[in-house]
Amino acid sequence: MHVVIQFRMPIKFQDTEEKTTGKNLYSYQKGAIDKIFERFENSPNDYHLLYQLPTGGGKTVIFSEIVRQYLKHHNKKVLVMTHRIELCKQTSSVLSEFGVLNKVIDSKAKLDDQNEFSCFVAMVETLNNRLNDDKLDISDIGLVIIDEAHYNSFTKLFKFFSKSFVLGVTATPLSSSIELPMTDNYDELIVGESIQDLIKNEFLASANMYSFNVGLTSLVIGANGDYTVKSSEDLYTNNEMLSKLMEAYKERCDGKKTLIFNNGINTSLFVYDLFRSAGYQVAHLDNTASKKERTLILEWFKKTPNAILTSVSILTTGFDEPTVESIILNRATKSLTLYYQMIGRGSRILKNKNSFDVIDLGNNFHRFGPWGSTNLDWQRIFKYPNYYLDGVLSDEDLESNFIYQMPDDIRSSFKNSKDVYFDI
């Protein structure tokens, strides 16, 4: 196959004019921008580049500055894709802060004025419909940016941009589907600043992780490779698990602003009733809530010091509340990406906050290792995802390594015995 390489004018961050809009960029963000433009300058027109940076590292800020610089130096347009409408609006807002005039392509958007814009922001499904209807002119799109690129919903749109440079950004370069590895759709991965470095340099809060062993052998793995909602609800709504949740909360989180993640709406409602009956300030949020309800709940959560918010999936991406002090994983997951997304919601740093607590009630810590583990090699995971996934321990293997401690009241009955053990 004949590949045409177009050489472009080099763009370095330090060569550009001083910005009067946007946010101040940190040195690691400037370095990432330089690396990305270096690839852009020396790669084929249709090169697909993936950039990894942890949640809280400022991916949106980085690609917004990239868009600003790109539009200044190239007579082409930019398209930014997201997988949720909330992210569309947030992305559009940040781009505007950087002085980038942009148009959100949603189901209600009129396209009569599309020629007046050089940057578009669109949700993947809406964009797919508009492109199949031939209602959006993409003939002049030179740069495509994909936020949360690990989601597979974006891959069906690549056929429309066969002559565009594609930049995918993600915190976890591991595809949401085993059948569609990211290495099939991206030519190269650039790994950004690590979680440990961001913590060391006071850009992220550190996580104090507490794991409570849970028997998970009753859980069923579904077609998507993760535990089914039905089997999770059966386990996490039983009295034993609800009691364990309350005990863990009282032991580690009592009086702290806490975000609880569940796998299933019924589980979250059970959790809501559990804490409400105990006299705690608690709210429940899932994807059936209206925009108004969601806004009111999140405003309440923000301003209430010791609030508890129990949720289902909806807050794993696009949610930024730095005042969160504790995260409870009241679920198990086989997804490394979801594990990092959930914990990342507590990692925003504040003047009086440099750490947060994580309660794991799904053996996720044992499955994936500590959040920000230096043992994670993102380049290897990107290139050989199956090798990584095959190395993740099964629930049976995890539970066989558990060490059970005898409760103090029972141990006191054998106070004259030096060595005591029991089998469960």
Feature-to-residue mapping (PLM):
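Conserved helicase ATPase core of P-loop NTP-dependent helicases/translocases
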Residues: 105-114, 270, 280-312
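Conserved Walker A/P-loop ATP-binding site and its immediately adjacent core
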Residues: 75-95
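Conserved segment of the helicase C-terminal RecA-like domain
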Residues: 346-376
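Conserved pre-motif I regulatory segment
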Residues: 7-52
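A short beta-strand element within the Helicase C-terminal
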Residues: 308-311, 317-332, 338-345, 355-360
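Walker A/P-loop
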Residues: 45-66
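Conserved interdomain linker/interface between the two RecA-like ATPase lobes of SF2 helicase motors
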Residues: 189-259
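Post-DEXD/H (motif II) to motif III coupling segment of the RecA-like Helicase ATP-binding lobe
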Residues: 151-209
